[in-house]
Amino acid sequence: APGEWYFNASEKTLYFFPPLGLNLATAKIEISALKHLIECKGQEDEPLKNVSFKGIHFVNAERTFMEKYEPLLRSDWCIYRGAAVVLENTENCTLADCTFSNLGGNAVFISRYNLSTTIRGCHFYDIGASAIALVGDTSAVRSVPNRYEKVTLPDQMDYVPGPNNHLYPRQCLIEDNLIHHIGRVEKQVAGVQIQVAAQITVRHNSIYQVPRAAINVGDGAFGGHLIEYNDAFETVLETSDHGAFNSWGRDRY
């Protein structure tokens, strides 16, 4: 079909079926060379603060399918901890009025400790995996229930209340974004994925044409999220046993 391609490694030849109207004699050919375009990383005891990106177009990052994935908590999710833009150990960082397109993996990954991250007014489309992932470290959860079949007996359970450490996003705002045509390569994805996080606000976003959930809350750690006034439609197009808004069970019970 038009737009499809095949690389014959033994012949070192790329075969491409051009779309109608494309002149190969004058076409521009671009090849991805990076999985992560920008990484903003501080230290847990010395976070990176007050960095803002505004009006930037992030495009053409490599695919990350079949890279090293890590299992998360109670759900069956595994995830690649990376994206075109990665924020880790940050405070008060902002992505505003940016465009993310033609990316092979996740677009934005808010990883481990992040306080007061804002993603506002951005456009995400033709994304290989998830648009926005807010994912803490499972070490922040006591008595980690990371598989269905793994059972923690009462005498082995950590009964201390609260997180085990600070390696998780909290008090972040995802607002007024347009997200569509994601999961072009991977299918266990979401427009907004929340896992091992606290007090995440997701509001006034439009999310459609996704293979799985528009918004997915992967576990019950640590709650306090506010999800309101989002427009989600044309979801769960390529998978099943899911929903436009999907959430999994509590982890501390």
Spell out what each predicted region is.
Residues A1-S101, A140-N164:
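Extracellular polysaccharide-degrading/modifying enzymes targeting complex plant/algal/animal polysaccharides
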Residues H36-D45, F65-M66, A83-N89, N106-Y113, ...:
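Glycine-rich beta-solenoid repeat tracts in large extracellular/virion proteins
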Residues P2, E11, V189, R212, ...:
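Active-site lining segments that contact anionic ligands and/or coordinate catalytic metals
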Residues K49-N60, E91-G105, N114-A129, T138-V160, ...:
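Right-handed parallel beta-helix
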